Amino acid sequence: MKLYHSNLNKKSRITRDPVAVSPVNELTALDPKQLKFQIAAALRIQNDYYPCFDWAFPPPITQKTPGSPAPQTLFRHPSVVPGRYSVYLHTPFCQSLCKFCYYPVIPGQQAGEMERYVEYLTREMALYAPELANDRCESVYVGGGTPTYLTPALLEKLLTSIHRHFRLTDDAEVTIESAPGTIPRDKIALLKEFGVNRLSYGIQTLDSALLATLNRDYSVSAAVRELEDAVAIIGNVNIDTMYGFDGESDDALHETLSTFVALGIPCVSIYALDGQRRNREIVRFEPSKDPYYERKIRIFRDARAFLTGQGFEPVLQNIFLQPARASYRHQLRRWNNVTLVALGMSSTGYAPRRIYQNHLSLKNYYAHIDEGKLPILESEEISQEIEIMREAVSQLRFTQVDLARLNEKYGVNLGAVFQDLIEALTELGYLQSEGRVLRLTDKAAPYNNIIPMLFAPDTLKAVIFGLPEEYRENFPLPHVLTQIGATQSAAMNPGGH
């Protein structure tokens, strides 16, 4: 059994994990009169425009604390969304390894290992259950891997265990990921019977020639039949599409989307293929230039225009749905700092003011559970300041941020804290506002991995100077942040209104 996984930073690049040490320089002081010109100059770069979820705030650059905290330690801070939590559960098994995949997966038949893994998942749930007994779970996301590669009996055991250990709300959203060839009609019916009310289907493209180059061995016509059954039985169905393949025509994504719209698919996710990730032998600091950069931007903009013209609304940067027929509460609620319980090998979770990740190997994952411990590899406790900006920055990156609501929730006036930055970005055409609601403009889209990060507290920006020099110089995000320097107009004072 071989586990496939690459260590990645959060910029769509394969690299060693950079860790900041003591900063070597001080952050340049804010000059309100020059800020607009500094931003304009710093953004004259080719950014990595890849619509994906591999963006995170705070960026993973600080030293983590190894070891597994006890549940009461993990949840020692009060939640800013009291009484509610979500669950992410990772199942690493897949029928085969797709050439574009970079997640921790175990391809091929592993029947015995699957049974063992599901058993350990139920034991991990039991470790969390007492600490969460008085709270309600509002969403569950079963990802992978391909969870529907599990047998019907194992899926039934897994879903039953979720309902047994966690108190789901009456309207809880329960999502499971799937792939072509893994959900015959009777399995879809079983999923619905045991509470699944949202299905995400990773089909990527309907171009058979492209599929053959990706190690995706399935019949397009059979996949379409599975989707028709899923829409008929579950209804709330998302399909993952991808573009940027070698030999792909400019119209390939549009043709794929047109077919799905005609099939009545109510939710569509769009991702761009990154050639760097496909080469598992490359480990480098410096990102190469993407010769198809402008083409990818054009294809994505055309796809967005097509979907919005068909009645779809963007709920995240790259996810579009028909509001009356689909929802995606789990992902949206992540950016409200709701507690996210991470289950399974390699899963990443969020306890109040603590980001954590489970062990990356089955051996260590099993060993910790055998010892009665949470299988946590490492964690990072964050300050209240970072917690506030985690919500604000993430919401700006993916949807929009309501400064009035955050002021009410945290007692901090971010409009005053970042007054000069907001004015500069607005004058440059990167930011627009309706009342106290801020959102990125279309002009900002190619820089949506960077512009929201300008709202990071200056204390966090200063940490970037502790990164290796080649990382600071060659990657867009640290390069821009160190060039611009401080962006806070005032100190943050949580609770002060």
Predicted regions and their residues:
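Flexible, acidic/Gly-rich N-terminal and inter-domain linker regions that tether
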Residues: 1-85, 428, 466-468, 474-494
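C-terminal scaffold of the Radical SAM
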Residues: 8-14, 18-21, 77, 107-131, ...
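Canonical Radical SAM [4Fe-4S] cluster-binding loop centered on the CxxxCxxC motif
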Residues: 81-117, 208
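Beta-strand-connecting loop/turn residues
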Residues: 94, 266, 435-437
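Short amphipathic alpha-helical interaction segments
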Residues: 412-424
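A short, conserved structural fragment
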Residues: 426-436
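Accessory beta->alpha helical hairpin/"wing" motif in late/C-terminal subdomains of nucleic-acid enzymes
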Residues: 435-452
